From Swiss-Prot:
The keyword Ribonucleoprotein does not apply. NCBIfam families: N-Ac-Glu-synth. It catalyses: L-glutamate + acetyl-CoA = N-acetyl-L-glutamate + CoA + H(+). This is Probable amino-acid acetyltransferase NAGS2, chloroplastic. Residues 455-603 form the N-acetyltransferase domain. Coiled coil: none annotated.
Length: 613
């Protein structure tokens, strides 16, 4: 999983305290370095921790969360350096995984108008310099409404769209311009000179921090008259200029995509921010769409929803279609489900292919035709093209009133996931450091909607025996796997999980639990030869680990002769045979001279349950 490094995960003392707090705005408000922290809030026992009269940022203060007594960092708190080093080592896989990825980020108008915007932009600048490519799409709805109110005018909405008269268009131009200038200014400063003076390149001390490029990166057209309503200068996305956006990203710039579009006749049109952002994410084949909002996605009990599969998000939106215009428009846009809706978890899940040249991506489909999103055209479902659905617009009175919570943002997330963007993150921007916590903390800090997590993974069935045998036979013949007869394989079938793609078994693995010892054996991880190098083995191992955790197991072990390196890279450590449960030791074929490896499982709080897949 890529949700992020688990910083400060042990029960020992730690200064990186955000990970020891409940995920609520009230707790995170205390992470301002100016505030004194109450040691009784910590969730660990620190025999050496004592309240101090003054608290300042430590020299290892990566995210402004570390605190220590002034002047006593090295003498009394040597654990700080250890935690700092540990954080970097644990974050390394995620730093590596995100580098070179393209994230489209929507920053809502409410967040831009609030006090948390500066910190979010600092984090974006930090991530940009780590090699993440950003397209920023700022919201302007609140700012436009405020400008109209100051001029004695009232905003008019019909459905998801604003009716843009001359006054509204002028306000939209002013709001977009002011926000663009502000974002460019906030992203321009480099890192603090005092922090880089020792090791930094002195010739770069006064360089501009982040280069921001903006311009006419998409073509628009008038929405026109719909159901008798003249929307004036309201625009819809016609086509994203993928080549120019990618050129700027390749050149090391952050692309700022405003909601002002330009028509073929030279008009300026006021477009919907979410429509622009979702259309851009689909067209350029973004790795993520990140929506920074002014609140969290909560369940009926008021708890944060950490994770939703595409099926679950789609189902939640569809259930509200009778009471929500935005949900109804989602159903209208993507269809009733017969064309591209995933089958139930026990059946075959379709295949999601990656974007090609940033212009076309496919999503889950049934039958012989895989629906395709094509920039500037729409979705081709095999029965003709869907016009005008370049992106998904949300807004209007429904979004402003929040009668349906953040259902509109969830609908947009499901829309782009169905179009091929594999991950969408819905984040509460009022939480300090939420972007870093979401990307570098294993369980995240927001709600992730994903189309690719455990795609096609399920428990094995009797009809899968032939497919499993086909995959493991070459590995048995080479001595990598222990030979199993058909009878042995059938008896162990309940312990197998498989990955199915287009009706074919492409990977398998087994988990044999030993409940008395609270551990389980991982066995028979195998991937079809033509599907290797696609991460299927990692997906299966992650699935096995989550399944083991759900069964109450605390450790996993395995026996291997030739694949030790693969498992060591995934957290397994060599152990003695005495660590293996007695009942399993009695059945070990010592003539194979296998090596034994063990891995302790970290309690999983990501919200991703294999029982839901």
């Amino acid at each position: 999983m890529e949700r992020g490094a688990l910083v400060g995960s042990s029960s020992t003392s730690s200064y990186y305290v955000p990970y020891h707090f409940r995920q609520s705005k009230s707790n995170f408000s205390s992470f301002k370095p100016k505030n004194k922290l109450n040691p009784t809030q910590f969730r660990f026992n620190c025999s050496w921790f004592k309240p101090v009269s003054s608290i300042t940022a430590a020299k290892c203060n990566m995210f402004d969360y570390a605190v220590t007594a002034a002047g006593d960092v090295e003498a009394e708190h040597p654990v700080d350096d250890k935690q700092f080093v540990r954080w970097f080592r644990e974050a390394w896989p995620y730093l590596w995984a995100h580098r070179g990825c393209t994230f489209v980020v929507i920053i809502s108008g409410e967040i831009i108008a609030g006090s948390s915007c500066d910190a979010i932009l600092k984090d974006i600048a930090f991530l940009h310099h780590l090699g993440i490519r950003f397209v920023l799409v700022p919201g302007t709805q609140e700012q436009i409404d405020q400008l109209l109110a100051e001029r004695g005018r009232e905003a008019t909405y019909v459905g998801r769209y604003r009716v843009t008269d001359a006054a509204s268009l002028q306000a939209a131009k002013e709001a977009a311009g002011a926000i663009s200038v502000m974002l460019e200014a906030k992203l321009s400063p480099g890192p603090s000179i005092c922090n880089i003076r020792r090791h930094g390149d002195r010739s770069r001390l006064h360089d501009i921090g982040v280069r921001v490029d903006t311009g006419n990166f998409f073509a628009a057209k008038r929405r026109g008259v719909v159901d008798g309503v003249d929307f004036g200068a309201t625009g819809e996305v016609k086509k994203i200029d993928v080549d120019r956006i990618c050129e700027r990203l390749d050149g090391g710039s952050v692309v700022l995509l405003r909601n002002l579009g330009h028509s073929s006749s030279g008009e300026v049109l006021n477009c919907n921010t979410y429509e622009v952002a979702t259309a851009c994410a689909l067209a350029i084949g973004a790795d993520k769409l990140i929506c920074i909002m002014d609140g969290p996605i909560l369940d009926e009990s008021g708890h944060l929803i950490h994770f939703l599969t595409l099926q679950e998000a789609d189902m939640l939106v569809r259930k509200r279609a009778q009471q929500s215009d935005i949900a109804a428009n989602y159903v209208k846009a993507v269809g009733d489900g017969s064309m591209a809706y995933p089958e139930p978890p026990n059946n075959t899940n379709g295949n999601i292919t990656s974007a090609q040249n940033g212009r076309a991506v496919s999503f889950w489909g049934n039958g012989n035709h895989t629906p395709i999103f094509q920039n500037g055209v729409g979705f081709d479902n095999g029965n003709g093209l869907w016009p005008c659905e370049q992106g998904f617009a949300i807004g209007g009175e429904e979004r402003l009133s929040r009668l349906n919570g953040y259902l509109s943002e969830l609908a947009a997330a499901a829309f782009v996931c169905r179009g091929g963007v594999k991950r969408v993150h819905l984040l509460d921007g009022t939480i300090s450091g939420v972007l870093l916590l979401e990307l570098f903390k294993r369980d995240g800090m927001g709600t992730m909607v994903a189309s690719d997590v455990y795609e096609g993974t399920r428990d094995a069935r009797v009809e899968d025996l032939a497919g499993i045998r086909h995959i493991i036979k070459p590995l048995e013949e080479s001595g990598i796997l222990v030979r199993r007869t058909d009878e042995e394989l059938l008896r162990a079938l309940d312990s197998f999980v498989v990955v199915e793609r287009e009706g074919q078994i492409i990977a398998c693995a087994a988990l044999f639990p030993f409940f008395k010892d609270k551990c389980g054996e991982v066995a028979a991880i195998a991937v079809a030869s033509d599907c290797r190098g696609q991460g299927q083995g990692d997906k299966l191992l992650d699935y096995i680990e989550k399944k083991a955790s759900s069964l109450g197991l605390e450790k996993l072990f395995l026996l291997t002769t030739r694949t030790a390196d693969w498992f060591v890279r995934r957290g397994f450590q060599e152990c003695s045979i005495e660590i293996i449960p007695e009942s399993r030791r009695q059945r070990i074929n010592l003539s194979r001279n296998s090596k034994y490896y063990m891995k302790k499982l970290i309690p999983d709080r990501s919200g991703i349950s294999v029982m839901r897949i």
